[in-house]
Amino acid sequence: MISFGFWNLIIVTLVALVLKNNWRLDDEKAAWKNSLFLKSSVIQQLIQFFRQPIVNFLVQAGVVLVVTRFLCYTGWLIYFLTQPNPPLWDFRWYYVASKLAHQHLSPFNVEIFTQSFCTLTKICGFIPPFVYPPNIIPLIWFLGYFSLNTAFTIWVVMHILAIGLALWGANILLKSKSRAFRTICTISVALIYGLVRDLQVGNVAIFVAVLILWMFIFARKHQDILAGVCLGLALCKPTLAALFVLYFLLKRRFSLVFISIVTVTSLVFLGLALTSNSLTQFLSDASRGFSLWLNDPSVSPYISISRLDLMVVGPRLFPNNPFVGKLLSDLIVLILVGLVGWYWYLQQSLTGWSKKIYLAELVLVSCLSIAINYSQETSSVMLIPAVVFLLNDLLYQIRYCTFSMKRMSVWLAGVCSLAVQTAVIHGWLIQSLANHWNVKAGELPYIMKVTIFALPSYAILAITVSILVLAISSLRQKQVLKFEPLNRVSNKNY
């Protein structure tokens, strides 16, 4: 809860002043002057409702308090993380792996890694093995030069810089110079739970998300060398980045793919050399480590509530029938991939199989990366492009289209699903509720497991479907706009 003491009062005041100063439409105000969307009776009623003094005050107060609470929480989190022995749980794996690499020992060997983990971190017992690919070793090599606490501090600073790059990249992709929309974009991206959670545990998901985001920015400008290097580096966590290699192959951006493959291959062999490993030995150790890693309760689809991917939906619904559970998850994923493939075919056929890349495609591939592969809470940072897409879609509707209740319902479904992945709902509400049970011991009631605690997984599915529907609808709208002299389009065919 927010403490309304002296310092918190100052923070609340500063946040309110900053938001007020930036809550301006600027160029958008003139662009919206003749908007058919805003002239709709439904929108006019909403505008009148929110213009009521009490409603306007409550909305503004709510935004100020949420932003203030978030800033206070993040500030205290950063402070505690820079103290001796902070709870950066995931970071410890990277640190131990780096230390072993400096000794030319293999972190992929289960016995060596477990013993070193106990020695370096003083945490012993069952330790999940290091299941990352060897191309991550050169990227975390520098950690081994520092003590544990110094490396902690450096890692936190790197995360803060990465969050800054994520916010910057999101604003680059936003199709508005309005301060109000840029403020909304910045707040919405910052509230994604994965950003805070990644900072809290010291994972690498934020780095991968930033590399993917800037890869798209560079690729859109046909700077394939920079984009390829970003993709090659992002493949240190292949569950989040591997689908983009396939995507660029389908887009025939072969130079970008070639550079990414050269980058990741160089890192792989360098990582193997640093750990005195051969490829066959690595594959043997990785296979054994992966089988042990699957026994971790935080990974099990039947126990874990931290997983976001759709592969846990079936096992949660049918815990006593593994075959049916896996079949259901596979079917959901197959249908989702098929629908995304259909959209891609429509997009390519309308653009003459162009090599140009689109934000909707980036968002859908990002969503699929979370949905079809093993994904934890930190992976929700991959939803940053989804925030920008939904804002850009709203801007497009206001500028060029008439109001459609069906389309706005889909848009609102996407926004509400994205809200589930924020620190407010996923981080504070759902996680706080989970503390009432011993989740790892399997004490969570079935009805809770398939409803409230499954919301993040359902939200990933809903976000993907919503954006897919909006993207297909936009294709039709833009086709009509080509033949509409007044640059207005009706959604009657939607």
Question: Residues of each region from the PLM?
Answer:
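Primarily membrane-embedded glycan-assembly and transfer machineries that use lipid-linked glycans
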Residues: M1-R220, D224-L226, F248-E377, I447-F453, ...
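Aromatic-enriched
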Residues: I2, C72, L391-Y494
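Hydrophobic cores of alpha-helical transmembrane segments in multi-pass inner/ER membrane proteins
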Residues: N8-V18, I335, I384-F389, P456-S473
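A cytosolic-side transmembrane-helix exit/cap motif
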Residues: A227-L231, S278-S284, C401-R407
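Central hydrophobic cores of alpha-helical transmembrane segments
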Residues: L231, S260-S266, E361-S366, K406-L418
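Transmembrane helices and adjacent periplasmic/lumenal helix-loop junctions
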Residues: L231-F248, I372-S379
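Membrane-embedded alpha-helical segments of transport systems
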Residues: C236-P238, S266-L270, A419-A423
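Hydrophobic/aromatic-rich transmembrane helices and adjacent perimembrane loops
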Residues: Q376-D393
